Amino acid sequence: MAFNKLKQGVSQRAKFFTSTKPYKSLAVLPLQDVKKAFDFAYEMSFGKSGEHRDHRSGGSYERKPGEIFANTFQGKLCEFAIYEVLRKNFDINEPDLETYGLGKWDDFDFEIKGKLLSIKSTKSFGHLLLLEKKDWNDKGEYIPSDNKHYDFTFLVRIKNDPEGIMKRERKLYSLNENKDELWKLFKDVSWDFDVPGFITNADLVYLIKNEFIIYRGDYLNGKTRMDATNYYCQAGDMKPLDDFRL
C-alpha cells in the first residue's frame, strides 16, 4: 500500500490532507464500557489515583485536569471500541483499568496470540494517526516502555468526543469536578465509532525512515497548530480493518 505525504500550502508551515477516509460508524459502545472508561479517566485526572503526563513528549503546553480527563476518556473509549470489534473473532484481553504512576499509564496494549496492539484515538473528523516523534526509535519501537515493539497500531475515531462536550459545558480547563455531576454529562450520549484502519510495525518503520513528519508549529489543514512533532499516517493510507489477520 502506498503512503502519501501531507501537502504543503502557500505557507511553509501549513499542511493539508491528501488521503482521507470518510467516517463510517461501526457500532455504539455499550454503557457498561463507557462507565468503566469514565471511572478510569476520572481517577487518572480529578481523582489523582494515577498520573497522566500534563504535556506531550515534544510539546510545551501543560494540560489542566479537565483536559487530561477528556483526553484519557477518549483514549479509553477507543480501546473499548477495538475490544468490542476484535473480541468477536479473537481471544483478546479487556482494556487495562489499573491506575499507574507517571510513565506507566501509556504502556497499554492488547495482546492477541503473542502480538501486541497499540490503539490511538482521534475525533470523528480526524484523518491522521499521530505518533510523537521523540517516543519512537528507528526500529518503530516505543522508547518510554523500554523500546517495546508493537506489531500493529490501530486508529479509532469517535463521535461526540469528550473534549467537545467538556468545552461546551465550560469544564475543559477545570481543576476539580464532582464525579457524579460530571457523569451526568456523558451517560446518555451515544458513543458511536469507526476504525479507519491500522498499520504494521513494518509500515511504521517505513514512515519513520521516509520522514513522514509534521513538526511542532505546523498548522494542520492550515488552522490546527501542532504542539509537538509527530510521525504520521493518513487515514486513507491505512490498511482496512477487514484485512487484519494473525
Cite the ranges covered by each PLM segment.
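Nucleic-acid endonuclease domains
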Residues: 1-108, 120-246
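Active-site beta-strand termini and strand-to-loop segments that position acidic
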Residues: 110-114
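Short hydrophobic-acidic sequence motifs that mark active-site Asp/Glu residues
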Residues: 116-118
